[in-house]
Amino acid sequence: MHRILIVTPNRKRLAEFAQTLIEQQDVEVAWADCGQAAIADVMKHPPLAVIIDDNLLDMPGIDLVRRLLPINALINTVMISDLSPEAFHEASEGLGLMAQLPPNPTKSDAREIWARLKRMSAMSVAQPRK
């Protein structure tokens, strides 16, 4: 089972997105409403990915990304942000974010993120050529 942690103070806004992820084969969605809860969760149950809202109850989402890196740099991170692509790139450069999602991600966004995660996890377990 692939575990995806969604970190947001507003589950209702992301309910359709999360439900679409849950409907994919072998996906489990977990929730945290703040950065501290997310950090504790990641340390206890390392997920395949963490999807982080831009504004959390206790810190900006980008700060959570920075705090997750030393805990487990291999976790795929996705940010929900209304920044322009250029401003987002500038703000997140060097943090290894997998993607940016719009403030109200859709079912289509969920399917695309899952497809990318599947491709990336398949690459990470691929055997080297001899």
Report residues per predicted region.
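Two-component/phosphorelay signaling modules centered on CheY-like receiver
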Residues: 11-30
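C-terminal output helix
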Residues: 87, 105-121
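Alpha-helical interaction/dimerization surfaces of two-component signaling modules
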Residues: 19-23, 41, 91
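Conserved phosphotransfer cores of two-component systems
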Residues: 43-45, 67-74, 95
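Alpha4 helix (beta4-alpha4-beta5 surface) of REC/receiver domains from two-component response regulators
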Residues: 63, 81-105
